[in-house]
Regions:
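N-terminal, membrane-interfacial amphipathic/helix-forming hydrophobic leader that caps
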Residues: 1-73, 242-285
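Alpha-helical transmembrane segments and their helix-start/interface "positive-inside/aromatic belt" motifs
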Residues: 5-22, 77-93, 214-218
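Juxtamembrane interface elements at the cytosolic ends of transmembrane helices
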Residues: 62-77, 105, 138-142
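Membrane-helix interface motif
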Residues: 27-40, 104-111, 233-236
Length: 285
């Protein structure tokens, strides 16, 4: 399929944004993290250690914001699309419910965290709610939105084959930065978190192109990370916080994969229902 010169220029810009942002993420973000870790607050306190883990993502989001503004004269939120806050909150709530019900059964030895007081738990609840927003938004843009724009710079509806190809690429792309994560390197069953990461990348891309918006995908990503950090298994992830509960087991159950599939299925059915209802209302009108 032939594309216009304007689309070719846009593709080159998207590629440059992706490359420069990733370079800034790993170089400037990494160096800033190392500098901050030399300070007592960021190296000795649990709050500081938790905050500093988000620094590379904040740098990444800053790069993305400036580059998109310079290259396309538009806000970063335009890339995400969607209907806004209601769509985000609804999807996040659905994901939290599905994840909360199913993933709890996939964990091993769940122990109540009685070390930290409720004040510290509340602090981490607020920190998680705030810091996970830029973290997950930056990852959605880099791992889902920019690859789609590079493959289809004219924003036409992707065919089935190209959509699956894009999703497969996004799945592999999403796995790569997580290869050194604690849940992969220290687990006796690393294949389960790796498959889960691939499914998140693959299914997120399919959902985003299906509903023509990445707001639901961003919301699912946010809700899943929020659940993992605040409620359970934060002890063995890179985002160590002060969860209400934590899982002492170093093994991951295959139910984690089932949880991922179920969450995407429920959200997809929800948006399919919404789409049919809107079509019916527009037809009646």
């Amino acid at each position: 399929m032939r594309i216009s010169e304007e689309a070719k220029t846009a593709r080159i810009r998207y590629i440059l944004i992706l490359v420069i942002s990733l370079a800034g993420w790993f170089s400037l973000g990494g160096m800033l993290t190392l500098v901050l870790k030399r300070l007592p607050f960021f190296s000795e306190t649990k709050t500081g250690i938790f905050i500093v883990t988000f620094v590379p993502h904040l740098v990444l989001l800053l790069f993305l914001t400036l580059l998109v503004r310079y290259a396309f004269r538009e806000k970063l939120t335009v890339l995400v699309g969607g209907k806004g806050t209601r769509e985000f909150l609804t999807t996040a709530l659905i994901t939290l419910v599905v994840t909360g019900i199913t993933e709890t059964f996939s964990l091993g030895n769940i122990v109540y965290n009685s070390t930290d007081g409720w004040g510290e738990k509340a602090l981490f609840l607020v920190l998680s709610a705030v810091l996970l927003l830029p973290q997950t938004l930056a990852e959605e843009i880099v791992f889902r939105i920019l690859p789609e724009r590079i493959l289809s710079p004219e924003e036409r509806n992707l065919g089935r084959c190209r959509r699956i190809l894009l999703a497969f690429f996004c799945g592999i792309f999403f796995v790569l930065p997580h290869l050194l994560n604690t849940e992969v390197t220290s687990s006796s069953t690393p294949v389960i978190p790796l498959v889960t990461y691939f499914l998140w990348g693959f299914l997120s891309s399919l959902l985003g192109t299906y509903v023509h918006s990445y707001v639901p995908v961003w919301a699912m990503h946010y809700a899943n990370n929020f659940f993992s950090v605040v409620i359970v298994s934060a002890e063995k992830t890179t985002l160590t916080g002060a969860p209400l509960f934590y899982d002492k087991s170093e093994e991951y159950s295959p139910l984690l994969i089932v949880t991922t599939l179920l969450a995407f299925l429920v959200v997809s059915l929800f948006f399919r229902h919404i789409g049919k209802r809107e079509d019916k209302e527009s037809f009646s009108g």
